[in-house]
Structure formats: C-alpha cells, structure tokens
UniProtKB/Swiss-Prot annotation:
Belongs to the UPF0260 family. PANTHER family: UPF0260 PROTEIN YCGN (PTHR37421:SF1). It comes from the Bacteria. Signal peptide: none annotated. It comes from Pseudomonas syringae pv. syringae (strain B728a). This is UPF0260 protein Psyr_1567. HAMAP family: UPF0260.
C-alpha cells in the first residue's frame, strides 16, 4: 500500500509554491475584493458589502483578473512575501490559513473538489454585495459587515 501524501499546502511553505499552487489557494470567496474602511482611532479594518467595480457580484470572480491593476491601480496583489500582513484577510482565507500553518476547510475546492461550495456554505458574499459603482464612497460606512483580524 502506498503511503499517503500530504497535500501541497500542508507540506510546502508559501515560498515553495509554484504559481499554479499559489493561485489555487484562492477559494473564490471574493472577500478580499470588498472595500474596507480603517478606523482612525484603533486602526481596525472593517469589511463592507461594497465590491470592487471589477468583481462579478454572483460568481465572486474578477471580471478582468489579468489586467485588473490597469483599471484598479490600488488592487492588492497577494504574494507569499506578504504572509506576515495577511491578518486583514478573512480567517477562512486559504492564503491566510496556509501562512498560519493551518489546513484548508472542508468546503475549500482543493479539499472537496467543488468550486461552488464556497457559495453553498455562504462563506462568500455572493448575492449580498453591491458594486462600488452604485454606492457613494461617503455612504460605505452604512454597509459594514465585519471586522478583520
């Protein structure tokens, strides 16, 4: 009987992942593409229901991923070198979990084989977001959903 091989995310560090492995850690929840507000008093970061103009509100996928930085210059491109900064990501985020040495959740597509599980389990904000094109920036505080961290 062959020995069981641990999945790549449990046996490699973030720096050891190839591009395909790195990209596959994304669970497709779209939460990193929600607009965030920082509290000036305690520097806490709060997520809003306001999505980047490029985010598909149903699929939670970027509509122009390859060129996103051209139309959204402040789009954050996650890299393994930023792992110590991942605390602002949701606690369910594959990048954050792996950076913390934790396993992926059962609903993650790399575990269950179903890319829609993130929506069925209501981890994503699919169907519950608004496009930044439809909400004035001054009103974003009215759409806070949770505190990062």
């Amino acid at each position: 009987m062959a020995a069981k091989v641990e999945p790549f995310w449990m046996r490699k560090t973030l720096d050891q992942l190839d591009t395909q492995e790195w990209e596959s850690l994304c669970d497709g929840c779209g939460l990193c593409c929600l607009q965030k507000l920082e509290d000036e008093e305690d520097n806490a970061v709060y997520y809003t229901r306001i999505a980047c103009k490029l985010l598909d509100l149903k699929t939670c996928q970027c509509s122009d991923y390859a060129n996103r930085r051209a139309s959204v210059p402040d789009c954050i491109q996650l890299t393994p070198g930023q792992a110590d900064e991942f605390k602002w990501l949701p606690p369910t985020c594959g990048y954050r979990l792996v950076s913390e040495g934790k396993d992926l959740p059962l609903w993650h597509h790399l575990v269950c084989g179903d890319r829609t599980a993130v929506h069925h389990e209501r981890i994503s904000q699919s169907g519950r977001m608004l496009s930044e094109n439809n909400v004035a920036e001054d009103d974003w505080e009215d759409y806070l959903i949770f505190r990062a961290g």
